[in-house]
């Protein structure tokens, strides 16, 4: 199989033009092209004056591929296609003594459980929240009625925090074994649109993710796995440094010497329990900030120029970073084109925001986190739980600033830059539900973060015209950008000091986003299989 890269066609080209373009690129007869698939499709809109093209990477089979490779020996855009197929590490023995346990059923837990089930290990999966459809109802209860269910919300429940997001499926992680392709293929098998296999920035969207997650759950069950909801792990059972099981909130004990912790970044009670049991963990950097909303049409014009609104391009996104004079870095986080800002708390008396988009990305506003990096040594010394304590203080204060009713504190960008409280909305209507309370966001975060963001917003104007629009809205606060701690693991992917405990995913500090969490779930399932089967890594 061969791979062609950098094959360019106008964005309005008919689908049937792709085959002739491949044939022309290789200089072969049409009959000599046996088959082809899209591996990647992207575009580069940085030069507004140039005609916009789709840029394709194509995998193909052809007659006499050896001759073609010889002909294009000096052409870096024609090569042998790499083997991106996934190969399991082994199969479970027929006499498996104990089933592995997976704690958490977000992206990491789903893919860990799915892979273990595909290898015949019949995992027991424990999720503290509810099934995704009930979870959706509970989440809307907060958004519409300010009623929070601490065990069923944006953070907890089937599908994890990624269910209520943009459903982004791209990552900057190194993936030499192409495990990310396995993740994408499994999503497609479960009902995700096939285009996620080749578009450069794939996403599924919240409503579509719901059905995909349900289908993956049923795949696991069909393979002999067990998925249990409203099962919160309250203790780990350890004997002489060896994990032997977990205890649930109802008192039930499940015995296993292989437990994957796929907790997500908001399981603060579980982190505290693990710390109390002596499981090694350490503080890690994370970021805090606000959500910013602009009209999506403004972002489209700034990013796509004359192609703004083109049906083949959809809503434009962006990625920004600014290094402030005070030494802090400010960057856009989890940008959601055509989406909404959502209430994402999982704890009573606290306010935290996140962003969400549907597959269509057709809401009126674009939103993104604008966040500032913070470090444990400088900003929250005091041990591995200090970051959690900082998050809790900030979120509790945001609750008060919003009126103590789950409304969020908000401010117009122009007023924030000028250092004066907002008293009325302008042309941009905030999307956060249950609502916002206008005021002064300088009261919501540490002074160094406010200073850095105030400097960054006008600087971002140089990259996106209109970014510092006076009426754009900042909504607070964004604190759960990533886990504030890492449950450190060794080369066998087990806890440093508790054998049989396999920390994984975003909550353990080893992923950030759906794709990287899914990849880590597969890697951790492989590690469990190798340990059970006595295989070397």
Report the location of each language-model feature.
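Residues forming the flavin
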Residues: 1-52, 58-537
């Amino acid at each position: 199989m061969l791979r062609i890269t950098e094959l360019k066609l106008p964005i309005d080209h008919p689908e049937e033009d792709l085959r002739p373009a491949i044939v022309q690129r290789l200089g072969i007869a049409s009959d000599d092209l046996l088959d082809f698939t899209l591996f990647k499709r992207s575009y580069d809109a940085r030069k507004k004056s140039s005609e916009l093209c789709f840029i394709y990477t194509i995998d193909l089979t052809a007659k006499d591929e050896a001759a073609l490779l010889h002909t294009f020996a000096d052409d870096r855009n024609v090569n042998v296609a790499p083997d991106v197929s996934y190969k399991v590490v082994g199969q479970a023995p027929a006499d498996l003594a104990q089933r592995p346990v997976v704690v958490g059923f977000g992206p990491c837990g789903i893919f860990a459980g799915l892979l273990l089930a595909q290898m015949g290990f019949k995992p027991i999966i424990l999720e503290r929240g509810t099934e995704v459809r009930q979870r959706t109802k509970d989440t809307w209860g907060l958004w519409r009625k300010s009623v929070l269910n601490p065990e069923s919300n944006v953070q907890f429940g089937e599908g994890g925090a990624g269910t209520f997001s943009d459903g982004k499926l791209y990552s900057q992680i190194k993936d030499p074994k192409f495990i990310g392709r396995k993740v994408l293929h499994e999503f497609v098998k479960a009902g995700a649109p096939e285009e996620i296999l080749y578009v450069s920035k794939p996403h599924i969207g919240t409503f579509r993710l719901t059905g995909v997650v349900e289908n993956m759950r049923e795949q696991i069950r069909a393979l002999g796995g067990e998925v249990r909801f409203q099962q919160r792990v309250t203790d780990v059972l350890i004997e002489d440094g060896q994990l032997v099981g977990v205890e649930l909130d109802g008192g039930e004990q499940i015995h296993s010497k292989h437990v994957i912790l796929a907790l997500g970044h908001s399981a603060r009670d579980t982190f505290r329990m693990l710390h109390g049991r002596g499981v090694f963990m350490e503080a890690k950097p994370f970021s805090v900030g606000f959500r910013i909303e602009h009209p999506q049409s403004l972002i489209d014009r700034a990013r796509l120029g004359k192609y703004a609104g083109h049906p083949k391009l959809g809503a434009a996104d962006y990625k920004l970073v600014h290094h402030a004079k005070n030494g802090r870095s400010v960057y856009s986080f989890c940008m959601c084109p055509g989406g909404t800002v959502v209430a994402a708390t999982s704890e009573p008396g606290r306010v935290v925001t996140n962003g969400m988009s549907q597959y269509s990305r057709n809401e009126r506003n674009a939103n993104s986190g604008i966040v500032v990096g913070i470090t444990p040594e400088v900003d929250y010394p005091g041990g591995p739980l200090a970051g959690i304590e900082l998050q809790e203080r900030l979120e509790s204060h945001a609750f008060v600033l919003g009126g103590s009713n789950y409304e969020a504190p908000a401010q117009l960008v122009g007023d924030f830059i000028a250092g004066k409280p907002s008293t009325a909305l302008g042309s941009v209507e905030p999307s956060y539900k249950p609502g916002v309370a206008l005021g002064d966001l300088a009261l919501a975060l540490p002074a160094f973060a406010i200073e850095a963001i105030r400097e960054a917003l006008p600087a971002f104007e140089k990259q996106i015209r209109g970014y510092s629009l006076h009426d754009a809205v900042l909504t607070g606060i964004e604190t759960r950008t990533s886990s504030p701690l890492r449950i450190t693991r060794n080369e066998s992917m087990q806890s440093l000091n508790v054998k049989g405990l396999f920390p994984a995913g975003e909550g353990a500090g080893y992923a950030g986003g759906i794709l990287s969490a899914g990849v880590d779930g597969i890697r951790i399932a492989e590690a469990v299989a190798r340990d059970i089967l006595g295989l070397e890594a």
